[in-house]
């Protein structure tokens, strides 16, 4: 039985209890959220070596980190080191987006190495297998696509991105309206090209019940992907994006009816004034399903600094109700991220998530900032470092200060405003 099926029967599972303890809420709160679809409990029934992860309404805003090989760069040891960095830097989940090398072996190694929930995009494996077999991606069969999904379930993958909303109708709306940058989702582009080449509907939409059977078998959460997300501000909130979201809302309801948990993926590149509206639209059309957003990025001109861009957009999106932030690294739009990029991306997204939690009134979020202020007032450097989002960097920066062991840092020295305010005698 799936988590959703048991929640519908009024049963609190062990996974729900573990999530409740971690979140500081009651197990019944988690159960009700799962039943209504506003919370998902993420853990494949074959991936029992990890703690389950709860994502959704009333819970802490979560952060995902992406990793994986490319067709041009295959280094499993580096990817496994990225898994370790994800754990140390405080990510809540990771996704293996590998497209190069022995995809299944890499996925299995990452799942086995991870102590957190693991997601994938199965169409990547299907496409890579087609290329490795010396045939065109366009020659993939529906059976091969579903076989890739089945293998992900067998390997213990906890959630999968599936671009079921990329249909002939939604792609047609993009063609009719026009876009500056076209389709920028890799899975979305593969699917759109496949439909055009084969003059056929997207198999993940046309055979959606087949997908639900696989997801139900392994209790994999479906992350309904935004294959038509905008890749630049000029394309944001256009007809193709909105039509896809309408379809995802309909598919979300069908999945719940089959006791399969669902979250929805969102943009992308969105002008700052449109971010809140995008969240509200998703929550309405998808009946409160958890929203998993990439950024969003409120400007297109910051390659090399897009972790900052994404954190700005992510903070607003999270405050408006987004539940799960996908990190963006400094390498976004430029190259495959290295180890430092992964760390930077996670920290930036965790900052955004914390800002969102303060705005949402999540219990304990504001208290951390109050405690930080107290530590600063007391010149409690160890307390400040331990509480900071990146203790290693905080400690390294402080140790560069000549007065690190005194009451003050090299920024102000004897002119420290806090020191001056505490003095009784004239300076």
Swiss-Prot record:
HAMAP family: ThiC. This is Phosphomethylpyrimidine synthase. Keywords: 4Fe-4S, Iron, Iron-sulfur, Lyase, Metal-binding, S-adenosyl-L-methionine, Thiamine biosynthesis, Zinc. Zn(2+) binds at residues 269, 333. Homodimer. Belongs to the ThiC family. The lineage of its organism: Bacteria, Pseudomonadati, Thermodesulfobacteriota, Syntrophia, Syntrophales. Pathway: Cofactor biosynthesis; thiamine diphosphate biosynthesis. Binds 1 [4Fe-4S] cluster per subunit. The cluster is coordinated with 3 cysteines and an exchangeable S-adenosyl-L-methionine. Substrate binds at residues 66, 95, 124, 163, 185-187, 226-229, 265, 292. GO terms for cellular component: cytosol. The keyword DNA repair does not apply.
